[in-house]
Amino acid sequence: MSVTMREMLEAGVHFGHQTRFWSPKMAPYIFGARNKIHIVNLEKTLAKYNEAMAFVKKLASSRGTILFVGTKRQAREIIGEEALRAGAPFVDQRWLGGMLTNFKTVKTSIKRLKDMEVAVEAGELEKMPKKEALTFRRELEKLQKSIGGIKEMAGLPDAIFVIDVGYHKIAITEAEKLGIPVIGVVDTNHSPDGVAYVIPGNDDSSRAIQLYARGVADAILEGRSQVVQDIVAAGGDDEFVEVQDAAQ
């Protein structure tokens, strides 16, 4: 989970966008400009990153759910892999409007997806006429692509982690409406409005995206392992008392 400024530098986290496309609201996080490209102040990024990771770890330690969101080309694979590693839900293809604000309807689609997967496992596809099987398979693939990453999400997430806030304005608006905190990577060309935990930095480089996503996944795993340690510690005391009682 811990990241150094050197690692951020090597991942290109400090490279912002062209100065003419900047958002003045990101001024506090900008160090300066080089060759008409804004340079992000990594001292501030590191502090904000650590603050965000502490929040994620605390949330995970209280069994909270963090939804990973990264649907642009260079983020998709990384987001999916890191979310799976952390056992967290994710959206890596397209954000469907109402994914949070209309979660009741999404749950119906999740049930449909799970039922279809059960049918495939049971060999139902082989029993269908060719045309019907083709239609079934197409629907299944469409559902897997759009909501496969959230099929184990029983309810609304406790927070969402977003790569590129400008690219996911709808997701952030929905989260804001429902009071769900947003952890967001915000580049120099976007506004940090609506983002509770801002990570100022490059949102285009795959190495930078990997650094953020790995950090969030690690923080979730650390938070969860803290829960296990606490349970074991509590259980260990009980067991000790029982053994003592039995001995007497």
UniProtKB/Swiss-Prot annotation:
GO biological process, one term: translation
Gene3D superfamilies, alphabetized: Glucose-6-phosphate isomerase like protein, domain 1, Helix hairpin bin
GO cellular component entries: cytosolic small ribosomal subunit
Gene Ontology MF terms: structural constituent of ribosome
Pfam families the record matches: Ribosomal_S2
Keyword DNA damage: no
Keyword Ribosomal protein (UniProt): yes
Swiss-Prot/TrEMBL keywords: Ribonucleoprotein, Ribosomal protein
UniProt similarity note: Belongs to the universal ribosomal protein uS2 family.
Protein's name according to its UniProt entry: Small ribosomal subunit protein uS2
Species this chain originates from: Dechloromonas aromatica (strain RCB)
Lineage: Bacteria, Pseudomonadati, Pseudomonadota, Betaproteobacteria, Rhodocyclales
